[in-house]
């Protein structure tokens, strides 16, 4: 008799994805982030569901309902801070996951990579709308500033913004629809993540060397299930430490002031995970140009497979491109720092230089270094 996990239609899918899946024997801890993102998503859906039971999407009561959750609901403060800081952990894992993909050349799996980019946009949209829901000062003004960027689109811009707002300003209609979208999007993300995995399992995983690993595969379970559990425990340790010791470390104090359309905060800025893109947006003096740069800062990832010039897939044996990669990482840290600073000298010029460097490394220097490295290899 065949084992039920190999014969049952439902268990068979799980078996082929998480148990008998052939995996390369040399994948490092950088391959843990896929499973960590899955854990983050599940955590966000569960905590979000419990928050939605007590939250009211109305401008008059939204702020009070969040306060009520923190003060009166059993462990409401814990659920709220797990959800808020869980989003930060989600983005940490997301950035490391994408960085791993760039470093080891995983973007050559075109379908998997492109769905990953769609996932990144979906998660960013979800996080943005979630930030609006507590209806604090930064929620309101963040929503106003970011949605207003769409007015830069020629001809239809203003109409589009008013259509999204459901009126002539960010108000009750905006809050209600943002709550609806914030609730539905994580389930769409979960579905997309399954498609992401489906395409990945068509090709099999990449590995640090970037070479074909078909000759040396091991079963996913028990080796990588145990390895993933260790990663999950470390993730939970960091998240719980953050929630219990410093829950407001990554938040903005302005969001503890109820939204007031008549009073603009001195520095409007998004959550830390959007600051790099916000810095790129602000570094261009033209509104439409800034919006295009903002979108392209993420969309540029879709060009990576086309910009790959090297005969080698991974950066493991490519020292020149390695240096460029780490300069790019440092540049992203710089942009994140600049995004949180006021718009004044010297921050403006630093942001502009960092933005130019960001696009130059990806579009010009990395493809050239790939060609140079191939030529150096030919000499030997």
UniProtKB/Swiss-Prot annotation:
Q: Which cofactor is recorded for it?
A: heme b
InterPro entries, sorted: Cyt_b/b6_C (IPR005798), Cyt_b/b6_C_sf (IPR036150), Cyt_b/b6_N (IPR005797), Cytb/b6-like_sf (IPR027387), Cytochrome_b (IPR030689), Cytochrome_b_C_euk/bac (IPR048260), Cytochrome_b_N_euk/bac (IPR048259), Di-haem_cyt_TM (IPR016174)
Protein localization = Mitochondrion inner membrane
Cite the binding residues for a ubiquinone: 201
Q: List the SUPFAM superfamilies hit by this protein, alphabetically.
A: a domain/subunit of cytochrome bc1 complex (Ubiquinol-cytochrome c reductase) (SSF81648), Transmembrane di-heme cytochromes (SSF81342)
Q: Which residues cross the membrane?
A: 33-53, 77-98, 113-133, 178-198, 226-246, 288-308, 320-340, 347-367
A Pfam family recorded for this sequence: Cytochrome_B
| Binding locations of heme b b562 | 83, 182
**Family stated for the protein in its record:** Belongs to the cytochrome b family.
What protein am I looking at? Cytochrome b
């Amino acid at each position: 008799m065949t084992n039920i996990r190999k014969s049952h239609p439902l268990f068979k899918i799980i078996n082929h994805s998480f148990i008998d899946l052939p995996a390369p024997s040399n994948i490092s801890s950088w391959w843990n982030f896929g499973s960590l993102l899955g854990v983050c998503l599940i955590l966000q859906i569960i905590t979000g569901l419990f928050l939605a039971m007590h939250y009211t999407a109305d401008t008059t009561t939204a702020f009070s309902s969040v306060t009520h959750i923190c003060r009166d609901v059993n462990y409401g403060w814990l659920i709220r801070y797990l959800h808020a800081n869980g989003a930060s952990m989600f983005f940490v894992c997301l950035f490391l996951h994408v960085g791993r993909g760039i470093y080891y050349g995983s973007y050559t799996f075109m379908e998997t990579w492109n769905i990953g980019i769609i996932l990144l946009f979906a998660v960013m949209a979800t996080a943005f709308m979630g930030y609006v829901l507590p209806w604090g000062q930064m929620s309101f003004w963040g929503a106003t500033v970011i949605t207003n960027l769409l007015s830069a689109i020629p001809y239809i811009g203003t109409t589009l913004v008013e259509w999204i707002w459901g009126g002539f300003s960010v108000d009750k209609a905006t809050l209600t629809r943002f709550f609806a979208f914030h609730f539905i999007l994580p389930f769409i993300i979960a579905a997309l993540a399954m498609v992401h995995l489906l395409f990945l399992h068509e090709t099999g995983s990449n590995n640090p060397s970037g070479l074909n690993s078909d000759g040396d595969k091991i079963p996913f379970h028990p080796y990588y299930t145990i390895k993933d559990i260790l990663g999950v425990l470390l993730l939970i340790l960091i998240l719980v430490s953050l929630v219990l010791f410093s829950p407001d470390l990554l938040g903005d104090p302005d969001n503890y002031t109820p939204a007031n359309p008549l009073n603009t905060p001195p520095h409007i800025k998004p959550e830390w995970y959007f600051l790099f893109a916000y810095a790129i947006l602000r570094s261009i003096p033209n509104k439409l140009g800034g919006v295009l740069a903002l979108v392209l800062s993420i969309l540029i990832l879709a060009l990576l497979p086309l910009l790959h010039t090297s005969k080698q897939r991974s950066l493991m044996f490519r020292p020149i491109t390695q240096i460029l990669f780490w300069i790019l990482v440092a540049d992203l840290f710089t942009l994140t720092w600049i995004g949180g600073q006021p718009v004044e000298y010297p921050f403006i010029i630093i942001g502009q230089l960092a933005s130019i460097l960001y696009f130059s490394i990806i579009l010009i220097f990395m493809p050239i270094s790939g060609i140079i490295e191939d030529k150096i290899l030919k000499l030997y």
